[in-house]
Amino acid sequence: MQKFPSIESLRHVIKRVRTHSEKNGLPYPIIEYTGSVKLHGTNAGVRVYDGKCIPQSRERELSIQSDNFGFAEFCSRKTNIFRLMADLMAAKDITFYGEWIGNGIQKGVGISKLSRRFVIFSAYDPIKGYITVENIVRIGWSASNLIHFIDEIPTYQVSIDFADPQPAANIITEYTLAVEKQCPWASKFDCSGIGEGIVWVPSDPELRKLSDLWFKSKGLEHKQTFEKTARVQIDTQKFNEINSLVDSIL
Protein backbone atom coordinates (compact mmCIF):
# COMPACT_ATOMS: atom_id res chain seq x y z
CA MET A 1 0.00 0.00 0.00
CA GLN A 2 1.03 3.60 -0.63
CA LYS A 3 0.89 5.54 2.64
CA PHE A 4 -0.24 9.14 2.58
CA PRO A 5 2.73 11.26 3.71
CA SER A 6 2.78 12.87 7.14
CA ILE A 7 2.36 16.64 7.03
CA GLU A 8 4.53 18.81 9.27
CA SER A 9 4.43 22.48 10.24
CA LEU A 10 5.51 25.54 8.27
CA ARG A 11 8.75 25.84 10.20
CA HIS A 12 9.90 22.50 8.76
CA VAL A 13 9.06 23.63 5.22
CA ILE A 14 10.93 26.91 5.72
CA LYS A 15 14.02 24.99 6.83
CA ARG A 16 13.87 22.63 3.83
CA VAL A 17 13.31 25.40 1.29
CA ARG A 18 16.07 27.60 2.68
CA THR A 19 18.53 24.70 2.85
CA HIS A 20 17.77 23.77 -0.77
CA SER A 21 18.18 27.38 -1.92
CA GLU A 22 21.46 27.85 -0.07
CA LYS A 23 22.95 24.59 -1.36
CA ASN A 24 22.11 25.56 -4.95
CA GLY A 25 23.04 29.24 -4.68
CA LEU A 26 19.46 30.36 -5.30
CA PRO A 27 17.46 33.19 -3.73
CA TYR A 28 14.73 32.22 -1.30
CA PRO A 29 11.55 31.76 -3.37
CA ILE A 30 8.08 33.20 -3.07
CA ILE A 31 5.48 30.43 -3.31
CA GLU A 32 1.72 30.80 -3.58
CA TYR A 33 -0.20 28.42 -1.31
CA THR A 34 -3.76 27.12 -1.23
CA GLY A 35 -5.27 26.02 2.07
CA SER A 36 -8.08 23.53 2.69
CA VAL A 37 -9.86 22.97 5.98
CA LYS A 38 -8.16 20.20 7.95
CA LEU A 39 -10.71 17.66 9.07
CA HIS A 40 -10.33 16.01 12.47
CA GLY A 41 -11.23 12.40 11.84
CA THR A 42 -8.97 9.51 10.89
CA ASN A 43 -6.81 9.28 7.77
CA ALA A 44 -8.16 6.77 5.27
CA GLY A 45 -7.71 5.64 1.70
CA VAL A 46 -9.09 3.27 -0.92
CA ARG A 47 -6.81 1.58 -3.43
CA VAL A 48 -8.49 0.41 -6.64
CA TYR A 49 -6.59 -2.05 -8.86
CA ASP A 50 -7.32 -5.31 -10.71
CA GLY A 51 -11.00 -4.78 -9.98
CA LYS A 52 -10.36 -4.80 -6.23
CA CYS A 53 -11.09 -2.04 -3.71
CA ILE A 54 -8.76 -2.21 -0.73
CA PRO A 55 -9.52 0.17 2.17
CA GLN A 56 -6.65 1.36 4.32
CA SER A 57 -5.82 3.47 7.34
CA ARG A 58 -2.64 5.52 7.42
CA GLU A 59 -0.67 2.47 8.56
CA ARG A 60 -2.35 -0.69 7.28
CA GLU A 61 -4.85 -2.32 4.98
CA LEU A 62 -8.29 -2.81 6.49
CA SER A 63 -10.98 -5.45 6.35
CA ILE A 64 -14.42 -5.78 7.90
CA GLN A 65 -12.84 -8.19 10.40
CA SER A 66 -10.03 -5.74 11.20
CA ASP A 67 -11.61 -2.35 10.67
CA ASN A 68 -10.95 1.25 11.68
CA PHE A 69 -14.11 3.02 12.88
CA GLY A 70 -16.18 1.14 10.30
CA PHE A 71 -14.36 2.46 7.22
CA ALA A 72 -13.86 -0.97 5.62
CA GLU A 73 -17.54 -1.78 6.11
CA PHE A 74 -18.44 1.57 4.50
CA CYS A 75 -16.18 0.85 1.52
CA SER A 76 -17.70 -2.60 1.06
CA ARG A 77 -20.99 -0.84 0.27
CA LYS A 78 -19.35 1.66 -2.11
CA THR A 79 -17.21 -0.67 -4.23
CA ASN A 80 -18.96 0.18 -7.50
CA ILE A 81 -18.55 3.90 -6.84
CA PHE A 82 -14.81 3.64 -6.25
CA ARG A 83 -14.41 1.45 -9.34
CA LEU A 84 -16.29 4.05 -11.40
CA MET A 85 -14.02 6.78 -10.04
CA ALA A 86 -10.96 4.81 -11.10
CA ASP A 87 -12.45 4.20 -14.56
CA LEU A 88 -13.19 7.91 -14.98
CA MET A 89 -9.54 8.60 -14.16
CA ALA A 90 -8.43 5.90 -16.65
CA ALA A 91 -6.30 4.49 -13.86
CA LYS A 92 -5.27 0.85 -13.55
CA ASP A 93 -3.97 1.44 -10.03
CA ILE A 94 -5.07 4.43 -7.97
CA THR A 95 -5.48 5.25 -4.29
CA PHE A 96 -7.99 7.85 -3.16
CA TYR A 97 -6.98 9.55 0.09
CA GLY A 98 -9.23 11.37 2.48
CA GLU A 99 -10.48 11.77 6.01
CA TRP A 100 -13.07 9.44 7.51
CA ILE A 101 -15.13 11.76 9.68
CA GLY A 102 -18.28 11.83 11.73
CA ASN A 103 -19.93 10.64 14.88
CA GLY A 104 -17.77 8.60 17.25
CA ILE A 105 -14.47 9.03 15.40
CA GLN A 106 -13.18 12.14 17.20
CA LYS A 107 -14.64 14.23 19.98
CA GLY A 108 -15.09 17.93 20.57
CA VAL A 109 -15.18 19.17 16.96
CA GLY A 110 -18.05 20.34 14.79
CA ILE A 111 -17.84 17.48 12.30
CA SER A 112 -18.22 14.90 15.08
CA LYS A 113 -21.94 15.76 14.96
CA LEU A 114 -22.25 14.50 11.37
CA SER A 115 -23.09 11.02 10.19
CA ARG A 116 -19.95 9.21 9.09
CA ARG A 117 -18.65 10.09 5.64
CA PHE A 118 -15.47 10.05 3.54
CA VAL A 119 -13.98 13.36 2.37
CA ILE A 120 -11.41 12.91 -0.41
CA PHE A 121 -8.52 15.36 -0.60
CA SER A 122 -6.01 13.69 -2.93
CA ALA A 123 -5.22 10.62 -5.02
CA TYR A 124 -2.09 8.73 -6.00
CA ASP A 125 -1.27 6.96 -9.25
CA PRO A 126 2.11 5.13 -9.42
CA ILE A 127 2.63 6.59 -12.91
CA LYS A 128 1.25 10.12 -12.47
CA GLY A 129 2.18 10.61 -8.82
CA TYR A 130 -0.04 12.62 -6.50
CA ILE A 131 -3.20 14.00 -8.09
CA THR A 132 -4.81 17.16 -6.78
CA VAL A 133 -8.42 16.99 -5.69
CA GLU A 134 -9.64 19.32 -8.44
CA ASN A 135 -8.26 16.88 -11.02
CA ILE A 136 -10.25 13.93 -9.71
CA VAL A 137 -13.05 13.33 -12.22
CA ARG A 138 -16.53 13.26 -10.67
CA ILE A 139 -19.02 13.13 -13.54
CA GLY A 140 -22.58 12.61 -12.35
CA TRP A 141 -21.45 12.79 -8.75
CA SER A 142 -23.93 12.72 -5.85
CA ALA A 143 -23.03 13.62 -2.26
CA SER A 144 -25.84 11.32 -1.13
CA ASN A 145 -23.22 8.55 -1.36
CA LEU A 146 -21.57 10.13 1.71
CA ILE A 147 -18.40 10.57 -0.32
CA HIS A 148 -17.30 14.19 -0.58
CA PHE A 149 -14.37 16.23 -1.89
CA ILE A 150 -12.41 18.70 0.20
CA ASP A 151 -12.87 21.50 -2.36
CA GLU A 152 -16.65 21.53 -1.93
CA ILE A 153 -16.12 24.54 0.34
CA PRO A 154 -13.95 27.62 -0.36
CA THR A 155 -10.20 27.40 0.05
CA TYR A 156 -7.70 29.95 1.39
CA GLN A 157 -4.82 31.69 -0.38
CA VAL A 158 -1.53 33.05 0.93
CA SER A 159 1.80 34.03 -0.62
CA ILE A 160 4.86 32.96 1.38
CA ASP A 161 8.12 34.83 0.92
CA PHE A 162 10.66 32.39 2.32
CA ALA A 163 13.06 35.28 2.91
CA ASP A 164 10.49 36.85 5.26
CA PRO A 165 7.68 34.42 6.16
CA GLN A 166 6.34 36.45 9.10
CA PRO A 167 3.64 38.37 7.14
CA ALA A 168 2.33 35.09 5.70
CA ALA A 169 2.37 33.50 9.16
CA ASN A 170 0.17 36.32 10.44
CA ILE A 171 -2.36 35.71 7.66
CA ILE A 172 -2.27 31.94 8.22
CA THR A 173 -2.90 32.52 11.92
CA GLU A 174 -6.00 34.62 11.22
CA TYR A 175 -7.42 31.99 8.87
CA THR A 176 -6.62 29.18 11.31
CA LEU A 177 -8.25 30.87 14.29
CA ALA A 178 -11.37 31.52 12.20
CA VAL A 179 -11.56 27.83 11.24
CA GLU A 180 -11.08 26.81 14.85
CA LYS A 181 -13.86 29.13 16.00
CA GLN A 182 -16.36 27.55 13.60
CA CYS A 183 -15.53 24.64 11.31
CA PRO A 184 -16.60 25.48 7.72
CA TRP A 185 -17.33 21.81 7.02
CA ALA A 186 -19.64 21.64 10.02
CA SER A 187 -21.31 24.84 8.81
CA LYS A 188 -21.87 23.24 5.40
CA PHE A 189 -24.22 20.79 7.11
CA ASP A 190 -25.75 23.37 9.48
CA CYS A 191 -23.79 22.17 12.52
CA SER A 192 -21.85 24.31 14.97
CA GLY A 193 -18.51 23.47 16.55
CA ILE A 194 -14.80 24.12 16.34
CA GLY A 195 -12.48 23.10 13.52
CA GLU A 196 -8.95 21.72 13.69
CA GLY A 197 -7.00 23.89 11.27
CA ILE A 198 -5.85 24.14 7.66
CA VAL A 199 -3.66 22.07 5.32
CA TRP A 200 -1.54 24.14 2.92
CA VAL A 201 -0.13 23.00 -0.43
CA PRO A 202 1.51 24.95 -3.28
CA SER A 203 -1.01 26.40 -5.72
CA ASP A 204 1.20 25.48 -8.68
CA PRO A 205 0.22 21.97 -9.88
CA GLU A 206 3.82 20.84 -10.33
CA LEU A 207 5.03 22.12 -6.96
CA ARG A 208 1.99 20.56 -5.33
CA LYS A 209 3.34 17.13 -6.20
CA LEU A 210 6.22 17.73 -3.76
CA SER A 211 4.90 16.64 -0.38
CA ASP A 212 7.94 18.23 1.33
CA LEU A 213 6.31 21.60 0.57
CA TRP A 214 3.02 20.74 2.29
CA PHE A 215 2.32 21.94 5.82
CA LYS A 216 -0.51 22.26 8.32
CA SER A 217 -1.61 24.96 10.75
CA LYS A 218 -3.64 23.95 13.78
CA GLY A 219 -5.74 26.02 16.15
CA LEU A 220 -4.76 26.45 19.78
CA GLU A 221 -7.23 23.82 20.98
CA HIS A 222 -5.40 21.21 18.88
CA LYS A 223 -1.80 22.10 19.69
CA GLN A 224 0.15 19.62 21.78
CA THR A 225 0.50 20.59 25.43
CA PHE A 226 4.25 21.14 25.13
CA GLU A 227 3.62 23.69 22.36
CA LYS A 228 1.55 25.89 24.68
CA THR A 229 4.44 27.71 26.34
CA ALA A 230 4.12 28.57 30.01
CA ARG A 231 4.70 32.26 29.42
CA VAL A 232 1.52 32.57 27.36
CA GLN A 233 -1.95 32.61 28.92
CA ILE A 234 -3.86 30.85 26.16
CA ASP A 235 -7.35 31.75 27.33
CA THR A 236 -6.91 35.40 28.34
CA GLN A 237 -6.94 37.75 25.34
CA LYS A 238 -7.18 37.42 21.58
CA PHE A 239 -3.84 39.19 21.22
CA ASN A 240 -2.06 36.55 23.27
CA GLU A 241 -3.81 33.75 21.39
CA ILE A 242 -2.67 35.09 18.03
CA ASN A 243 0.92 35.63 19.15
CA SER A 244 1.08 32.13 20.60
CA LEU A 245 -0.18 30.55 17.40
CA VAL A 246 2.14 32.62 15.20
CA ASP A 247 5.07 31.49 17.35
CA SER A 248 4.06 27.85 16.98
CA ILE A 249 3.67 28.20 13.19
CA LEU A 250 7.13 29.67 12.79
Regions found by a protein language model. Name each.
Residues 1-250:
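Core nucleotide-handling region used for phosphoryl-transfer chemistry
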